[in-house]
A protein has these predicted regions:
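Secretory targeting signatures
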Residues: 1-45
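Metal-centered catalytic cores of metalloenzymes
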Residues: 20, 34, 40-97, 101-182
Length: 182
């Protein structure tokens, strides 16, 4: 947000010079304050984070036909919430999905539980779609007690992944590293 003040100096008198100075000072102060707020609140502006989920990304790799994707969208201006959508097809007996802390090729601790599911409630399941909103209260493990901005920083640093767990593969059937779309 930029605030513009237009002043016609041609018609100003000496008496109004102090008013001109005050107006300019207030305008500059407003621009500086708004710029400071905007730079912190838009740290992740235009950054959606995505993951393509496959069995080959699991550690060790899992032989499965299941695939999926996940998208995480920071909600501006505060970046203290993240909307997400996780889809998977060709997958059965899903028990949970998480964001884990971990670099590619390594397993890591759970940072966020996206959902848990009782597969006996839907035995004919052949896919899953889940969406929701994350806040700081959802953070656990290495991110417990931290802010959503810490999760976003970890995602941006390529040190988080999404995986979906099943009865057949309790450590994860499909996985994908989260990365920025920018």
């Amino acid at each position: 947000m930029v605030i513009y003040h237009i002043i016609d100096i041609k018609w100003m008198t000496i008496k109004n010079n102090s008013m001109l100075f005050l107006t300019i000072a207030l305008a500059l102060g407003s621009v500086i304050a708004v710029s400071t707020i905007s730079s912190t609140s838009t740290a992740f502006a235009n950054h959606d984070f995505v993951a393509n989920l496959t069995g080959q990304e699991e550690v060790p790799p899992v032989d499965t036909q299941a695939t999926g994707d996940a998208i995480f969208i920071p909600i501006l201006p505060s970046n203290d919430t993240v909307d997400f959508n996780v889809n998977a097809s060709g997958i059965q007996n899903v028990t949970a999905a998480h964001i884990h802390s971990g670099i590619p090729g390594e397993n890591g601790p759970i940072a966020v539980t996206l959902f848990t599911f009782d597969p006996t409630q839907n035995p004919d399941q052949n896919g899953i779609t889940i969406n929701g909103t994350l806040t700081g209260i959802n953070l656990e493990g290495p991110l417990q007690g931290k802010a959503i901005s810490d999760l976003l920083t970890a995602i941006k640093d390529n040190s988080t992944y999404v995986n979906i767990h099943t009865v057949q593969n309790p450590n994860g059937e499909i996985r994908g590293q989260l990365s920025s779309t920018k």
